[in-house]
Amino acid sequence: MDETRVMDQLRTLNESELFYRAYRLAKFSPSGFEAFIHQIDREQVRRLNLLVPEWPDTIQAEYLESQFFSPDRRVGIHVSKHNCYTPPVPHHHNFFELFYVLEGRCSHQIREHTSAMSAGDLCFIQPRVTHALDVSDESVVIDVLIRKSTFRHYFYSILQGDNLLANFFMSTLYSERGIDYLIFHTGDDPALHRAFVELCGEYMEKQDYYSVLVNAIVTKIFVLLLRKYMDACELPQDQFHDSQTAVRIARYLQTNAATATLGGMAAEFHYTPEYASRLIKQMTGQTFIQLLTTVRLENAEQLLRDTAMPVADIAAAVGYESSEHFIRTFRKHVGLTPSGYRQKKRA
């Protein structure tokens, strides 16, 4: 789909947006608004999942992956235009969100912080962070929702970098103390603009293998940000230190998963073992052994997907002396044997 057709579709108001525009216009007249609320078609509200703040049963505080993603784990990205005029309702979710102002402007609130966003601005939001987006006119804002598991499976190389973007995602994947948001001001960068238009076009058409191309375009967006905008990033500084500590520990365990011990990790960071154990529990909600097991199994998943190494060799490479113990542990946490996991990912 060419850029003109994509932009025409994005600029055309859909049924939900027409409702929300009428809702906003009605609010200018108290008497007119009361009449508007009384004549709302409840079937339309149900069918379109419309948000009507005056009807509490239409408001959700939490959104789950199952509401946006199919059970097919290969499709881990959902792309849509944020509906214009939607009432800005605070909410959170258990996946990552990225939104990009393609044209126009919007206002975004995260906890107590409000940002005015304009064309070219891009914002990453962590899971579990309460926020609200207000597109009060016919601006075009693109929403990209990304499963947490998608980062481990498809953006593994991005996570290996020592940069702010990688650390942002790592801090949530391995810690309960992540950075709430990152904002990039990219202005009229034509490469990013084209990438988001292409992303929307692919997702609208859903041709064969579209999910592969969607993953590739999102990777391209990440790379463009890494190349040009790491020094012009806005983030909550008060959360930076704790998140960096969590990331350093996670990276240490990724690199040394096969041989890591609590004592060795504590010595690396100049902690006592007791303090290191408490710190890991506070940051991740897991014990050292639980976190180490998580990292070892993620390393094993990557080797099963991307190499032809025998299962026994993978077990040894990630830190298991016994292949049988590795297979039992893998099956307990992943729900499949290592061979079954490899077969499923290559199907």
Predicted regions located by residue number:
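Generic protein-terminus/edge-of-domain signal
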Residues: M1-R105
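A hydrophobic/aromatic-rich effector-binding and dimerization subdomain
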Residues: D2-R21, P53-D57, A61-F68, R73-R74, ...
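N-terminal regulatory/effector-sensing and dimerization cores
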Residues: F68, R74-A166
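Short, Lys/Arg-enriched, Trp-marked, Pro/Gly-tolerant hinge/linker segments that flank
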Residues: I183-T186, M204-V214, V223-R251, T255, ...
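Short helix-capping/hinge SLiMs at alpha-helix to coil transitions
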Residues: T255-A257, D306
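Basic/polar phosphate-binding segments, predominantly the helix-turn-helix DNA-binding elements
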Residues: T259, G263-V295, M309, A315-G340, ...
